[in-house]
């Protein structure tokens, strides 16, 4: 089965399931669905940053400070976060990612999904999926901040990261 054929839950403004559809149709019709974002850090606290491959269905060739993806039909956010983190980082046996917050991403142009944000400590080395990741590295928070204005980032990941920073600043 191709990624476009994967069945996703369609959800309403309250994150309640109202139907299912293939991923390709979900994207083409701008149907609200669910996604997870996992901020992966190494033992030194550096953040895993990567550039998506040019073949990705959404936001190809852009940089991201999260690993993650869509939540499959019937899958919990927590299970999806662990599955996606292990798949994209190419590691197994990760601890269950810690949930941080959830928000509704909506770019106003037909891309909208409930987004659950997590964090996890990741042992090295990582072996990212070549189908998903064109480049990767671990950056300090300062290095990441320096690149926010110069690299082209996935807009949903950037929205999640801005909320994460705002939450830290409010503490």
Residue spans for each PLM region:
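Acidic, metal-coordinating catalytic segment for phosphate/diphosphate chemistry
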Residues: 2-37, 43
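Short, well-ordered strand-loop elements centered on a beta-strand within folded domains, enriched
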Residues: 17-20, 45-51, 125-129
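Basic/polar N-terminal segments that are highly enriched at the extreme N-terminus
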Residues: 1-4, 169-171
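Conserved Nudix-box catalytic region and its N-terminal flanking loop in Nudix hydrolases
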Residues: 25-36, 42-83, 87
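Short, structured loop/turn "capping" segments at alpha-beta junctions
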Residues: 91-98
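Short helix-to-loop capping/linker segments positioned immediately adjacent to catalytic or ligand/cofactor-binding
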Residues: 15, 92, 103-107
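Nudix hydrolase/Nudix homology domain
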Residues: 21-24, 61-63, 73, 99-171
